[in-house]
């Protein structure tokens, strides 16, 4: 392993440590996603807290955190066997960001970004699987879990030299989804559909609570 490869691994981790969800939330005045909603700093939770535009920006930035270092390493002619580990470093940065007290996301979007340079076939297989499961089930977490379970198989069939790092990524993401898996088994996992309505109901409830407390204070 060359010094350039080690440098790229470090840079990939540091880039991954830039939490898009937290930064976008701060800029747009949204609540900190680590302390609200599902407490996960990712696009899905930002969607719950702030709407589609902010969530889309977070999603694109998270994907870019995975794609950019792998493409740059490929451009610098780093050996293919190390490209996958550079992608793993980017995902580790997203999951355990050094700049945000190691409280990161679950790494799905960043992992998708690392797989995009493998080829359009791989990217299409991963995105297609996620979309199909999401549309059929309505569960973002279930779509992510099934996609990462199938990703090593897709990689083995398309570019087997990347199977090991993709398998490592899949294991990391599954571990990060252990709470979602438990909620899915209990039937307590919220669906994507209807989240905005649920959020509006919660806001109305909070406004009612504030009004009630104000009335009680006025009576005193």
Curated annotation (Swiss-Prot):
GO cellular component, one term: plasma membrane
Associated pathway: Lipid metabolism; phospholipid metabolism
Composition skew (Basic and acidic residues), residue ranges: 210-220
GO molecular function, one term: acyl-phosphate glycerol-3-phosphate acyltransferase activity
Transmembrane segments: 4-24, 53-73, 80-100, 116-136, 138-158
Mode of membrane association: Multi-pass membrane protein
Region of interest (Disordered), residue spans: 193-220
One biological process term in Gene Ontology: phospholipid biosynthetic process
Catalytic reaction annotation: an acyl phosphate + sn-glycerol 3-phosphate = a 1-acyl-sn-glycero-3-phosphate + phosphate
Main location: membrane
Location within or outside the cell: Cell inner membrane
PANTHER family: GLYCEROL-3-PHOSPHATE ACYLTRANSFERASE-RELATED, INNER MEMBRANE PROTEIN YGIH
Protein's job: Catalyzes the transfer of an acyl group from acyl-phosphate (acyl-PO(4)) to glycerol-3-phosphate (G3P) to form lysophosphatidic acid (LPA). This enzyme utilizes acyl-phosphate as fatty acyl donor, but not acyl-CoA or acyl-ACP.
Name of the protein: Glycerol-3-phosphate acyltransferase
Native organism: Aeromonas salmonicida (strain A449)
């Amino acid at each position: 392993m060359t010094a350039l490869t080690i440098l790229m691994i470090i840079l990939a981790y540091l880039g991954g440590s830039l939490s898009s969800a937290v930064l976008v939330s701060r800029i747009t005045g949204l609540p900190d996603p680590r302390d609200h909603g599902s407490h996960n700093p990712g696009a899905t939770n930002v969607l719950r807290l702030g709407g589609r535009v902010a969530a889309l920006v977070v999603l694109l930035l998270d994907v870019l955190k995975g794609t950019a270092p792998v493409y740059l390493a490929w451009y610098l002619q780093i050996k293919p066997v190390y490209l996958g580990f550079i992608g793993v470093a980017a995902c580790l940065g997203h999951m355990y960001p050094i700049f945000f007290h190691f409280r990161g996301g679950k790494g799905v979007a960043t992992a998708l970004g690392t797989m995009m340079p493998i080829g359009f076939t791989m990217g299409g297989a991963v995105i297609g699987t996620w979309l199909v499961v999401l549309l059929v089930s309505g569960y973002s977490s279930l779509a992510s879990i099934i996609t990462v379970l199938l990703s090593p198989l897709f990689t083995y069939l398309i570019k087997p030299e990347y199977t090991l790092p993709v398998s490592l990524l899949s294991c990391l993401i599954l571990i990060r989804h252990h709470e979602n898996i438990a909620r899915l088994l209990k039937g307590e996992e919220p669906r994507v559909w209807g989240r905005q309505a649920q959020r509006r109901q919660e806001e109305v409830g909070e406004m009612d609570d504030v009004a009630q407390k104000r009335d009680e204070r006025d009576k005193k």
